[in-house]
Amino acid sequence: MMIHIHQDKKMSTRSNKKSTKTEKVAKATKPVENVEVSDNEVQEQAVKTKASGKKVTAKSTKQSGGKNAKSGSKSAKSGSKSAKSGSKTSKTQSGGKGDESRDRYFKLIDAKTGRSFGRYTGGTPKQAASKGFTKMIHKIKAEGGALPKNGTMKIYLRESTRGSPRKVYAYEATRKQLTEPQKIEIEGSDGKKKVITYRYRNVIHKVSAPLPNQLGGLKTSRSNKKSGETKKSGSRSSGSKRSAKPTKSAKNAKSTGNKKVSTKSAGAKKAPAAKASR
């Protein structure tokens, strides 16, 4: 009888284990109940999602905006640098020493007396010489004088522009008659247009020969005078320094000469002493 009871206990434990397993499976496979959600809860959830989306977009826009601002500042800096470089180039183009487009002023010089007269403008001394040459010819014709046979004249100009070195320029000018006269319209000081006819053309060449003594000879500018004086003074000072300082070879030659003289004098003194002993 005891054996049957023990077997029944085993069977009961097995059945209990199976029942617990089935309960667990039933719990896991419970059907999902239909949950009723009100409209207010749905709206609240939508508002929350919208707010979170705004925060995310705001953060992203802030980050992108900061980067764009940095890049914008860099571009602004580069723009300012380019503007500075542009201002430098405009300065060099508009004015300065290297600007050849600005007007310069010159005066004609009489080679015999050395007096200057007239005032002629031009970007280069050659242009001013052409204007001065035409003025001289008109003056000679008005006074009834005779033009030179060759038709060539020497013209001397001195620059009178403020800040210039007052350099003197020499040119040879001739006239050539045109086959057909040229007519050019020019607006006068009163605002009316005037027609000027040109029958001659000026041909001007620079003269490389030295200037007359009345005009200062070769000394055509103040800068050349100053440079010549400094060169002369420099050569004199260098010569005096060289003569004052003796070289090492000269010192060595003097010392060897003194040694030879001393040895000769010693030999001369010893010779008579030997003769006396004999």
Swiss-Prot record:
SUPFAM superfamilies: Chromosomal protein MC1. It comes from the Viruses. Residues 249-260 have a biased composition (Polar residues). Residues 1-11, 97-107 have a biased composition (Basic and acidic residues). GO terms for biological process: DNA protection. Coiled coil: none annotated. Residues 62-94, 264-278 have a biased composition (Low complexity). Residues 1-107, 206-278 are annotated as: Disordered. This is Uncharacterized protein R252. It comes from Acanthamoeba polyphaga mimivirus (APMV). The lineage of its organism: Viruses, Varidnaviria, Bamfordvirae, Nucleocytoviricota, Megaviricetes.
